[in-house]
């Protein structure tokens, strides 16, 4: 916290409790969070916005946004079945108007939970519960893209929720895409297809980079 090397480790356990440890491995005094409603299957996230720390985690249906002591920082009333492969990511509005965390449910609906307490949902298509989702600026235009890898389908939508490009693999990749930035506008996305023993590298327009797959 506060760049003073006062590190904390937050561990979600099967007993539905979140344990807070210091860097020596001792339980932290003053940690007040009691328990979640169901088991947490993803790591606890730490985000810092301005001078405030946000600990964000989700159980099967509920999202929790806490302060560093385990108190509720933002109350959320939205319940949805969380996708097991996708954790929360932080999104800061370009105009500085606010922040939100973003994730998907088991059908691929995108849920924005704003730090103001409001929520927003975007449905682009219907996906399986094992999809991968990322929310990134893929082409350097300072606008975010919705990126889905579901089975053997790769689909990328722009900020206006229009399909930018798609690609169908012969076999289904089993790991999430990896993103590379070589310059402000030169950004690429890599996908490993283990069953084909091939690596795919996509330009930000959806075309395969020269020489790929390899």
Each language-model region and where it sits:
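Extracytoplasmic/lumenal domain signature
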Residues: 1-214
């Amino acid at each position: 916290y506060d760049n003073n090397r006062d590190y904390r480790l937050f561990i979600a356990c099967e007993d539905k409790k979140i344990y807070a440890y210091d860097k020596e491995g001792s339980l932290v005094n003053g940690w007040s969070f009691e328990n979640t409603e169901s088991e947490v299957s993803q790591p606890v996230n730490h985000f810092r916005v301005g001078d405030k720390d946000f600990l964000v985690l989700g159980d099967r249906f509920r999202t929790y946004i806490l302060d560093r002591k385990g108190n509720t920082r933002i109350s959320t009333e939205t319940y949805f079945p969380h996708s097991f492969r996708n954790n929360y990511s932080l999104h800061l509005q370009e105009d500085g108007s606010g922040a939100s965390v973003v994730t998907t449910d088991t059908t691929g609906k995108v849920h924005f939970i704003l730090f103001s307490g409001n929520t927003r949902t975007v449905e682009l298509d219907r996906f399986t519960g094992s999809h991968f989702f990322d929310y990134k600026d893929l082409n350097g235009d300072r606008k975010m893209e919705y990126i889905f890898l579901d089975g053997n389908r790769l689909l990328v939508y722009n900020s206006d929720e229009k399909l930018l490009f798609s690609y169908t693999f012969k076999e289904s990749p089993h790991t999430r895409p990896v993103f590379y930035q070589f310059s402000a506008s030169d950004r690429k996305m890599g996908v490993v297809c283990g069953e084909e023993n091939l690596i795919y590298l996509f330009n930000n327009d959806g075309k395969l980079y020269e020489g790929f797959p390899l």
